[in-house]
């Protein structure tokens, strides 16, 4: 047993170092001493006593003592270093292995594993910084134009139907943590123009974005935040060959999601090929916290602010202002998450394409103004929610038509599916009501603007006064105390006399839609919201016409009754006299 222990101790001494191996030697020596002590306790033989007093045991103890005395601290190693490289080497080794010995194979493999893992984490968590560093190195080594062409060609290989061209350098912005592109052109290829529902040719003055590999691994796209400035171009939406075809089918990944989206100073010419109408859409400022392709309409209504112009008519989407938060009511809009207001200033009916639509093809001229309050629920369908949670979007619309011009069309109004909305017999009273109202208000305006009703009288005098004296025509005023009686107010009303000169027809309606019905839609015409709005507007318009006819009939009955009663009174008084 003793030769085995001796050989083991020798090998341990040769493998010993400054730290860990010294502890191994001390443990071996302690084990040797405990073994000897146990053997001595078992039996006090002369052989065991001789082993304790042997020179080999004393030699091992001497070596351990020398190693403990020669142990050097970090400060002593640094004091003996001669240069920066030596100090860096000592600090690095002391941080990693707490010593100054060479690295072992296991330690080197561990360092390489941690290095690779850290690079993977850097790419996942800091994708924009990683790509910015690559672009910076590429711009430093190669020409900037070559880098832009290479990136554009690489993107075109993986994007079907879309052509991307970088006409200027790609510069990383370190302060903002973005990658900026100058003069970027994005357009559809000729093959996609022939077969797709959507074709576009857009030019971006400045395009900044951030990337996220983590989002890309989740299947939600590589681009995270997008900032667009100076976008202009043409966008055309074609007619769908299939009834179930939607605009989202153009995109290869319908689950694509963007983070923060900002667009400013942009102009787009949109063409609706189905009705042959062009719209000039100007976007002054748009800020959205998120944009998901599957919920694009809801995210648009949830935008922080959207302001722009449609054919030079201003529109805006913003959070509606109300007085309830002034009273510090936490759940003042429950069960709604937010109430957004969509406002469109007066716009010509022809600019809006209303005369070319199937539902309002009898309108030839005039203007329309719209105010819509959209009540959005607190939760989205993909989140876990109880069954009693509100999942409906309520749209409260107020549409004002002004100076409408109506005429009978050869085709009756119809819905988007071709179903007849109203018949010609039901349409005739509407056209008569609109045209009679327009004729009445136009005559009143001509009467007010007629110079004969406000003449300027001039009198020539022979005295030393000025040659011409101007006497303005003054408006007649009732005596004091009778100011409540208006000039145009009649005691007995013989005809319809409106209270103002604005030929406005105000229609109101409310539409409720389940959130799932707005999923995977980019346009309102892809949903049946437009058809429901047309039905509600026609119902309100017919109700207005019936109320007007009833009021007119009631006024004539009052007039005839008053006239007949006055004649009887005069006849009775005459008979008495």
Curated annotation (Swiss-Prot):
Its main location: mitochondrion. Residues 12-115 are mitochondrial matrix. InterPro entries: Mdm31/Mdm32 (IPR012571). Residues 1-11 form a transit peptide. One of its GO terms (biological process) is intracellular monoatomic ion homeostasis. Residues 137-556 are mitochondrial intermembrane. The chain crosses the membrane at residues 116-136, 557-577. One of its GO terms (cellular component) is mitochondrial inner membrane. It holds the Pfam family MDM31_MDM32. It is a multi-pass membrane protein. Keywords: Membrane, Mitochondrion, Mitochondrion inner membrane, Transit peptide, Transmembrane, Transmembrane helix. It is found in: Mitochondrion inner membrane. Belongs to the MDM31/MDM32 family. Involved in the organization of the mitochondrial membranes and the global structure of the mitochondria. Also required for mitochondrial distribution and mobility as well as for the maintenance of mitochondrial DNA nucleoids structures. This is Mitochondrial distribution and morphology protein 32. The gene is MDM32.
């Amino acid at each position: 047993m003793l030769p085995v222990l001796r050989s083991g101790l020798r090998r341990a001494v040769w493998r010993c170092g400054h730290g860990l191996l010294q502890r191994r030697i001390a443990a071996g020596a302690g084990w040797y001493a405990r073994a000897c002590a146990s053997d001595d306790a078992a039996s006090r033989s002369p052989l065991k006593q001789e082993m304790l007093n042997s020179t080999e045991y004393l030699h091992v103890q001497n070596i351990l003592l020398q190693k403990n005395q020669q142990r050097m601290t970090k400060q002593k190693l640094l004091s003996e270093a001669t240069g920066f490289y030596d100090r860096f080497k000592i600090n690095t080794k002391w941080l990693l292995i707490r010593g100054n010995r060479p690295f072992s194979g296991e330690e080197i493999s561990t360092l390489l594993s941690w290095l690779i893992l850290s690079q993977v984490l850097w790419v996942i968590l800091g994708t924009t910084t990683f790509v910015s560093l690559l672009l910076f190195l590429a711009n430093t080594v190669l020409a900037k134009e070559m880098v832009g062409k290479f990136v554009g060609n690489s993107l075109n290989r993986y994007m079907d139907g879309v052509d991307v061209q970088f006409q200027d350098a790609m510069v990383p912005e370190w302060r903002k943590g973005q990658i900026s592109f100058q003069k970027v052109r994005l357009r559809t290829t000729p093959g996609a123009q022939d077969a797709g529902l959507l074709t576009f040719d857009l030019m971006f003055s400045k395009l900044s974005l951030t990337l996220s590999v983590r989002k890309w691994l989740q299947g939600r796209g590589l681009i995270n935040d997008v900032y667009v400035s100076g976008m202009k171009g043409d966008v055309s939406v074609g007619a769908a060959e299939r009834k179930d075809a939607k605009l989202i089918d153009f995109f290869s990944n319908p689950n694509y999601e963007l983070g923060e989206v900002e667009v400013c100073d942009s102009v787009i010419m949109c063409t609706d090929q189905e009705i042959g109408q062009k719209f000039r859409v100007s976007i002054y400022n748009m800020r959205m916290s998120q944009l998901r392709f599957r919920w694009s309409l809801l995210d648009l209504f949830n935008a922080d602010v959207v302001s722009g112009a449609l054919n030079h008519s201003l529109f805006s989407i913003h959070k509606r202002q109300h007085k309830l938060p002034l009273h510090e009511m936490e759940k003042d809009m429950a069960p709604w998450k937010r109430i957004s207001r969509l406002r469109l200033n007066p716009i010509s009916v022809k600019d809006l394409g209303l005369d070319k639509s199937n539902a309002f093809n009898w309108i030839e001229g005039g203007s329309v103004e719209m105010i819509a309050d959209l009540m959005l629920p607190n939760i989205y369908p993909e989140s876990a929610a109880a069954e009693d949670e509100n999942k409906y979007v309520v749209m409260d619309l107020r549409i004002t038509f002004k100076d409408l011009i109506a005429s009978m069309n050869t085709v009756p109004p119809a819905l988007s599916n071709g179903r007849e909305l109203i018949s010609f017999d039901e349409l005739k009273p509407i056209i008569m009501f609109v045209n009679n109202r327009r004729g009445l208000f136009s005559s009143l305006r001509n009467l007010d603007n007629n110079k004969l009703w406000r003449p300027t009288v001039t009198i020539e005098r022979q005295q030393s006064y000025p040659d011409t004296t101007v006497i303005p025509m003054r408006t007649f005023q009732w005596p004091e105390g009778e100011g409540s009686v208006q000039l145009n107010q009649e005691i007995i009303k013989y005809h319809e006399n409106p209270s103002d000169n604005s030929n406005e027809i105000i229609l109101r309606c409310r539409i409720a839609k389940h959130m799932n019905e707005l999923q995977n839609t980019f346009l309102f015409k892809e949903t049946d919201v437009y058809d429901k709005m047309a039905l509600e507007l026609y119902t309100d318009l017919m109700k207005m016409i019936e109320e007007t006819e009833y009021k007119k009939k009631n006024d004539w009955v009052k007039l005839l009754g008053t006239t007949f009663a006055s004649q009887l009174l005069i006849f009775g008084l005459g008979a008495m006299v």
